[in-house]
Curated annotation (Swiss-Prot):
Tree of life domain: Bacteria
InterPro entries (alphabetical): SlyX (IPR007236)
Family affiliation: Belongs to the SlyX family.
UniProt organism field: Mesorhizobium japonicum (strain LMG 29417 / CECT 9101 / MAFF 303099)
Lineage of origin: Bacteria, Pseudomonadati, Pseudomonadota, Alphaproteobacteria, Hyphomicrobiales
HAMAP family: SlyX
The name this protein goes by in its record: Protein SlyX homolog
TM annotation in the entry: none
Gene name per UniProt: slyX
């Protein structure tokens, strides 16, 4: 294998390795953001359900007046 071809392959391999490392870092950051957003969504859902329970009083089951 000629030296220049080997050098080209080594350069490509190094570039691909760098790209993979960058993408891996970006994925890790995205997962951190996703986990934080999921926690916020869970907290907001809990707050919403609590407010919904407070706002909607229990409606008693009664028969209409014509019964």
């Amino acid at each position: 294998m000629p030296a220049d071809r080997l050098t080209t392959l080594e350069i490509r391999a190094a570039e691909q390795e760098r790209t993979i490392e960058e993408l891996s870092g970006q994925i890790a950051e995205q997962w951190t953001v996703i986990e934080r957003m999921q926690r916020k969504l869970d907290a907001l859902t809990d707050r919403f359900l609590a407010l919904e329970e407070q706002a909607a009083p229990d409606v008693p089951v009664t028969k209409p007046p014509h019964w």
